[in-house]
Amino acid sequence: MKRKHKRLLFTVVTFAIFGMSVVVVLNKLQNNISFFFTPTEVLSNAIYNNNRDIRIGGMIIKGSVEKHDDFISFYITDLENHMKILYKGILPPLFSEGSWIVAKGKMVSSEFIADEILAKHDENYKPSKYKTK
């Protein structure tokens, strides 16, 4: 083989290995990306037809939180549509009616069974002496 052909072969093999590495890394990271869907997106598409976990985010509707013996149920909205969420576990401290949450779980018929709840907080920090009620 000529030197030119060896260099070309080395370059092609290097790019092929690099490309495969990128594909493997992106495939592994796919499940950890923190995007979420709104209730409108979930209800309008067949997003939940597969058995993969999805994240859904929205505001907890006031008056919708119901505590049962072993789980809690509530409705979230994106100010267009609403969806029922069922959760069994310890709620985050920032969980309250009117606050925004992101829930991770699966759709079962028309209800969302959450495995994890993340409460979103206000990005505007105010020291307690300046807070107004």
Swiss-Prot record:
Single annotated GO MF: heme binding
Periplasmic side: 29-133
Top-level taxonomic group: Bacteria
Subcellular location: Cell inner membrane
Keywords, comma-separated and alphabetical: Cell inner membrane, Cell membrane, Cytochrome c-type biogenesis, Heme, Iron, Membrane, Metal-binding, Signal-anchor, Transmembrane, Transmembrane helix
Main location: membrane
Topology of this chain in the membrane: Single-pass type II membrane protein
GO annotation, biological process: cytochrome complex assembly
CC per GO annotation: plasma membrane
Membrane-spanning residues: 8-28
Protein's UniProt keywords contain Metal-binding: yes
Keyword Membrane: yes
Positions with a binding annotation for heme: 121, 125
Cytoplasmic side: 1-7
Family stated for the protein in its record: Belongs to the CcmE/CycJ family.
HAMAP family according to UniProt: CcmE
Function: Heme chaperone required for the biogenesis of c-type cytochromes. Transiently binds heme delivered by CcmC and transfers the heme to apo-cytochromes in a process facilitated by CcmF and CcmH.
Name used for this protein in its record: Cytochrome c-type biogenesis protein CcmE
Organism listed in the record: Ehrlichia chaffeensis (strain ATCC CRL-10679 / Arkansas)
Taxonomic lineage: Bacteria, Pseudomonadati, Pseudomonadota, Alphaproteobacteria, Rickettsiales
Gene designation: ccmE
